[in-house]
Amino acid sequence: MFIPVIMAGGSGSRLWPLSRSAFPKQFLSLDSSSQHTMLQATIERLQGLPIAEPIVISNEDHRFIVAEQIRRYGKKSRIILEPAGRNTAPAIALAAFTAIEQEDDPVLLVLAADHFVKNKSAFQAAISQAAQQAEAGKLATFGIVPTTPETGYGYIHRGEEVTQGTYEINSFVEKPQLNIAEQYLASGEYYWNSGCFMFKASVFLNELKQHSPEIYRQCELAMQGLSHDYDFIRVGVEEFLKCPDDSIDYAVMEHTKLGVVVSMDAGWSDVGSWSALWEVSDKDADGNVCQGDAILSGTSNCYIYAPNKLVAAVGLKDIVVVETKDAVLVADKNQVQEVKKIVEHLKAENRAEYREHRERYRPWGKSDAIDKGERYKVNRITVEPGKKQSLQMHYHRAEHWVVVSGTAKVTCEGNVKVITENQSLYIPIGTNHMIENPGKIPLELIEIQSGSYLNEDDVVRFEDK
């Protein structure tokens, strides 16, 4: 039995406008053949293997999204919250320390939450092969059999064969120029670096202590400040912030004598761009990938994503069109790496479209800002069963609530009232109020805010529950 360690950090900025800093690609459903998000799919493709409860590494901003997606998938997990991003070596170290505290030196399978794998059986076969190496005290990494001279991936140069499909590691190679990548592909001796690993927790920590002692030390100190908060595991903030920022490749794998690479040919992709997503998606006879409501005429090799509005495309070739509730991307499929520049521009201007979608997820449910104008704003709010918002008050706005479905238990200036479908309630300016869903189905209501100042910082509240 082994423990999956799922790294759920990262911003996925090249998949904007679908992926945003507050809701990046690992939490999206990008596979047209599945309803699972990428995080859920990462867990799903392990089904049938002898796995223990996963450890998921996330951050404060995404903690409720992680917890809710795993809950909806029907699994339990341990969620470690990093105080700040410090790359993969410290993150994996926290997971290894956590695993050793709770189990007797388990084998860890380290995976990214935002990868795509087409062939589940080939993926699991490679894991079984790597597990044998891990049990023998090796640090196994997965090398992806390359299909193109990709310049966006790092490479692993394999050495002598250890067993069939498993090799010693000669070297790790940075992202190459095209002519070098073509040589790598022709040689048959190089793999794409997947960034996924399998090893015993103790073996990894011993090698980390030897080759990157400062990372080991700061993570060990951070674990001494460990605390539990509902589903979450928090570590000492000050100690972790002193930890060097380094990848597992630089911190351990390039130095260890215990490394091996296991060959994997499973239709893997890190889905790092819209063109990469087009590559791995099912296509129609004209090479188009369509999700949502799209009508095409004379169009080929395009990616069309239209979940909210009808998108009509005429005479297009090699174009990406992505429609969301508050932004639309139109791009040449061969230049989609430049989307990152758009994201940088949005960030510099502090645009909301950089940070989050119009529909925003909260600890208690979600809120969709469906309309706004001079002195008013309209939200469609969903409160999950058993959840409630914090007790709060606003200085500049009043609120009108109309229940669409479900039952609301409202506390207003200490008075409790239950309202149901087609009933409404008025919350005056300066009134303490709280809404709760005591029922068994989601509570949906329309909230109309009115007043002279409608920004989110006009709120005095306790912590969301």
Curated annotation (Swiss-Prot):
EC number: 2.7.7.13
A Gene Ontology BP annotation from the UniProt entry: GDP-mannose biosynthetic process
Pathway as given in its UniProt record: Nucleotide-sugar biosynthesis; GDP-alpha-D-mannose biosynthesis; GDP-alpha-D-mannose from alpha-D-mannose 1-phosphate (GTP route): step 1/1; Bacterial outer membrane biogenesis; LPS O-antigen biosynthesis
Entries under Pfam families matching the protein: ManC_GMP_beta-helix (PF22640), MannoseP_isomer (PF01050), NTP_transferase (PF00483)
This protein's UniProt keywords: GTP-binding, Lipopolysaccharide biosynthesis, Nucleotide-binding, Nucleotidyltransferase, Transferase
Catalytic reactions on record: alpha-D-mannose 1-phosphate + GTP + H(+) = GDP-alpha-D-mannose + diphosphate
Class of the enzyme per the UniProt entry, highest EC level: transferase
Highest rank taxon of the organism: Bacteria
GO MF annotation, one: GTP binding
InterPro entries listed in its UniProt record: GMPP_N, Man1P_GuaTrfase/Man6P_Isoase, Man6P_isomerase-2_C, ManC/GMP-like_b-helix, Mannose-6P_isomerase_type2, NTP_transferase_dom, Nucleotide-diphossugar_trans, RmlC-like_jellyroll
PANTHER family membership: MANNOSE-1-PHOSPHATE GUANYLYLTRANSFERASE
Similarity comment text for this entry: Belongs to the mannose-6-phosphate isomerase type 2 family.
NCBIfam families: GMP_PMI
Protein name: Putative mannose-1-phosphate guanylyltransferase
Lineage start: Bacteria, Pseudomonadati, Pseudomonadota, Gammaproteobacteria, Vibrionales
